[in-house]
Amino acid sequence: MRVLVTGGAGFIGSNIVETLVERGHEVIVLDNFFMGKKENLQEISDKIEFVEGSITDENLINKITKDVDVICNQAAASSSPMFSLDGLRSAVNVNVDGFNIILKSAVENNVKRVVYASTSSIYGNNPPPLREDMKVIPPNFYAATKLMNEYSAALFSQNHGLETVGFRYMSIYGRHEEGKTIYANLVTQFLWMMQKGKRPIIYGDGKQTRDFVYSKDVARANLMAIESKKKLSGEVLNIGIGKATSLNQLIVLLNKALGEKIKPKYVRMPVKNYIKTQRADIKKTKKVLHFSAKYSLEEGLKDILKN
């Protein structure tokens, strides 16, 4: 199968590309290196076709989606702080206009399916377990653009017969996060600090929870959606492990994995609309894709440190 992965040199994208190559698929990678890094793909650089560019370049997207079976869209302004007043216009342009260009080109070039990244941020502070049929009110511009993606995908499925499946990613950690720097997952940020003997900084009391899911599991979910024989029209699915871990518990697990006894530093919460709890309901994902995560948080940490 010939698959285009946008944002394929980034954190999640590169994990997906590695999995697709291992599976024997023909992969085209598109990335503009805003946060992606060539180093993320160096081990498989001779097994992929690479195109440097942005999903906002309509002529380029129309050109490279010819003879493609599936598009896996991971390109995005992928963190709420990127949507400051100064960056708002360009971030929305990438997430909304860029994604619509992907969908339009897919229809025009007879691409069978678009698999794309949405976000659990859409749920805001809805009480867990978070279900795909919940009423959602996005708490920030980032989440709003991702909800718009879901609406656009559903309309392209309804009006043009394009198969689409969006993943509401929970809190992803794993390999290849270096390019995300300050936008990296809390697991990775805490790990980086503790490996240097520094105290990780926790906003608030540390009782806030996240559904931490390992990047290898996320890549496998994308692979399953790409390869699925089912008709996936306008689907939206949670990707998590279905278990909540507090930041205090995370520190305990990191200390155990590192053989350390480093205490966190607690500071006042400066973030408005901060998400306090997160745990996915994964029943629909199991039913539609037959997917469930293989890695617990402890197992994921061991795998990262092993590599």
Protein language model features and the residues they cover:
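N-terminal Rossmann-like NAD(P)+-binding domain of SDR-like oxidoreductases, especially those catalyzing
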Residues: 1-170
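Hydrophobic "lid"/C-terminal helical patch
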Residues: 16, 222-226, 254, 301-305
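Amphipathic alpha-helical segment in the mid-to-C-terminal domain
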Residues: 141, 179, 183, 215, ...
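Glycine/proline-rich active-site loop of Rossmann-fold NAD(P)-dependent oxidoreductases
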Residues: 147, 172-188, 198-199, 203, ...
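Hydrophobic alpha-helix immediately C-terminal to the catalytic Tyr-X-X-X-Lys motif of short-chain
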Residues: 148, 152, 156, 186, ...
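C-terminal "lid/loop" region of Rossmann-like NAD(P)-dependent oxidoreductases
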Residues: 205, 234-237, 246-251, 259-277
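Conserved C-terminal active-site "lid" loop/helix of NAD(P)H-dependent oxidoreductases
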Residues: 215, 270-292, 299, 303
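Non-catalytic, hydrophobic alpha-helical segments
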Residues: 218, 222, 239, 250, ...
